[in-house]
């Protein structure tokens, strides 16, 4: 077993207990998803106040809910198409709230440059999700690109715990631009190839 595998097993032990408890108490996975977004709003508020470490801790808690909701759905046989839709919509609210918290902070500090960087990072972060959703309405899969939501959340946590959030916004922004471009090009090629096959 690798070191990361061992760490994964250790971390999963308490999460399995939480998942089992939620299933036993018949807590609906959609409820867990909603609790997660409320906790992320609290993290956004902490960011707005400049309390980065507090925000980082709250984000860790919020993402426990984000992780277990799907597991609880499987364990309790409550998987549904609406559940997947609900999860995606709530994730967008969670993401945007974190960006808005930072924008509020930087605006209060009169750091117009950081406000612009964060706003652009937010815009392209939203576009990474939109381009994939729109592409997958036309082609089977569009999972290309590096900057998915899990990577964004990890970067947010790194920025919070290291007090380097402005640098993290640059990283998220740049990688999101490349991800959006990659998905546009990939979708174009897939559609072009499909049209050539039909022709």
Would you name each region that the model predicts?
Residues 1-19, 89-199:
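A feature for the membrane-embedded catalytic helix bundles of lipid/isoprenoid biosynthetic enzymes
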Residues 30-33, 179:
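Ser/Thr-centric signal marking residues that sit
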Residues 18-23, 27, 63:
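Intramembrane alpha-helical segments
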């Amino acid at each position: 077993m690798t070191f990361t595998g061992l760490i994964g097993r250790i971390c999963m032990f308490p999460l399995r207990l939480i998942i089992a408890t939620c299933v036993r108490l018949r807590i609906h996975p959609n409820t867990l998803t909603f609790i997660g977004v409320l906790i992320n709003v609290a993290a956004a508020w902490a960011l707005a106040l400049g309390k980065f470490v507090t925000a980082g801790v709250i984000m860790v808690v919020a993402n426990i809910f984000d992780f277990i909701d799907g597991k609880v759905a499987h364990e309790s046989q409550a998987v549904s198409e609406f559940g997947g839709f609900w999860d995606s919509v709530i994730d967008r609210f969670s993401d945007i709230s974190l960006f808005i918290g930072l924008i509020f902070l930087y605006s209060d500090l009169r750091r117009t440059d950081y406000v612009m960087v964060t706003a652009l990072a937010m815009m392209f972060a939203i576009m990474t999700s939109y381009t994939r959703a729109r592409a997958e309405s036309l082609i089977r899969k569009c999972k290309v690109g590096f900057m998915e939501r899990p990577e964004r959340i990890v970067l947010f946590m790194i920025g919070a715990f290291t007090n380097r959030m402005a640098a993290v916004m640059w990283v998220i922004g740049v990688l999101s631009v490349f991800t959006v471009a990659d998905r546009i090009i990939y979708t174009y090629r897939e559609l072009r190839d499909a049209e050539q096959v039909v022709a």
